[in-house]
Amino acid sequence: MVLITQLGAALAVFSALTVAAPTKGKARFSAPQVGIPKKAKHHPAAAYARALHKFGMKIPKAVSDAAKGSVPTTPTQNDEQYVTQVTVGGSTLNLDLDTGSADLWVFSTETPQDESQGHNIYKPSSGAKRLDGYSWEIKYGDSSSAHGDVFLDTVTVGGVTTSSQAVESAKEVSSQFVKDKATDGLMGLSFSVLNTVQPQPQKTFFDNVLSQLEQPLFTCTLKHGEPGTYDFGYIDDSKHTGEIAYTQVDNSNGWWGFTADGYSIGGGSNSSYSLYGAQHKRANGGSISGIADTGTTLMLLSDDVVGDYYQNVQGATQDQMQGGWVFPCDANLPDFILNIGGYNAVVPGKFMNFQEIDNSMCFGGLQSSGGGSTPNIFGDVFLKSQFVVWDTQGPRIGFAPQA
């Protein structure tokens, strides 16, 4: 993704761009994920490089070099990718829902056949309108990219439809996307100011259906090792326990940004824990500001926090050849706890084992954001541990333990 620098100008044009379906104000719908066999054998550093590039961070050479490699996968680990089925025009596509971007881009009839083979493709409906002179382009840190044209077409998720959604049709995609047969594109759920369409950014699907919804929010219940669910327009109280802890969102740059009060490290991958238990051995002062992003696989935090965590993992080392922190796959991994307004959001230690590199070493789900002024990223490693509410009123974001 590219960073948008003229935010004010972009915001000024949104009201005239797209029109949602007739207002009902009572809609609520659920969009469950589905599991797709994962055939691509990317090195885990590729996910790390993508995250760094997406948020404008410098990509260390070691990470860039490692991202170009591959590793074997096993049927029992990293064997599925979780996507959401979305009807675009007349086509049902498997899309990644991404709260860190604002583009809806897809493989299409415009994509060369040798690139689209094995993917479901978008076929513009009879009522689709091409936006002449409009284009889009995305680039990621692992050298993957895509670009193309823009149509206005009907998009439906969970039975709720907008008839004038900007659909970014891929005319060319890089080999990294071609090889990833599990996904047919991406649907952004950040604030619309981040949309990359030129000459005028377009609204997200969520913004286009907002007036139809019972409540101006969506929730996600992402799971570790199984499909999760996105719910739009309502909060399903059966999916969480206890009260939801809310904190203010900083959306000045278009992202779902928030500030945690601090963190602690304790417990372990084989231990039980309570939210306020004595096993949470270390409490560290100083707030942590970051971005909640379902489109980033890893959790990226400052060097001092990352180093603090891995000094509690026996055998952990920062491996230049692998592009990040690695550790013995049988290591005991402590829990990571983020304190948000008095609520302790616990990431179980087992979530920190992102991917096996070889028969003995594994790549960590927590990596460095690079420090300095670069943002911290609370990606799927963190979000899969929580029930999360993304509320445009405020705006604010809420967290609770999953039921």
UniProtKB/Swiss-Prot annotation:
Enzyme class of the recorded protein, top EC level: hydrolase
Species of origin: Arthroderma gypseum (strain ATCC MYA-4604 / CBS 118893)
Family indicated by similarity: Belongs to the peptidase A1 family.
Keywords tagged on the record: Aspartyl protease, Disulfide bond, Glycoprotein, Hydrolase, Protease, Secreted, Signal, Zymogen
Full protein name: Aspartic protease pepA
Assembly notes: Monomer.
Glycosylation sites: N270
Disulfide cross-links: C329-C362
Residues at the active site: D98, D293
PROSITE patterns: ASP_PROTEASE, PEPTIDASE_A1
BP-aspect Gene Ontology terms: proteolysis
Location(s) in or outside the cell: Secreted
One of the record's GO cellular component terms: extracellular region
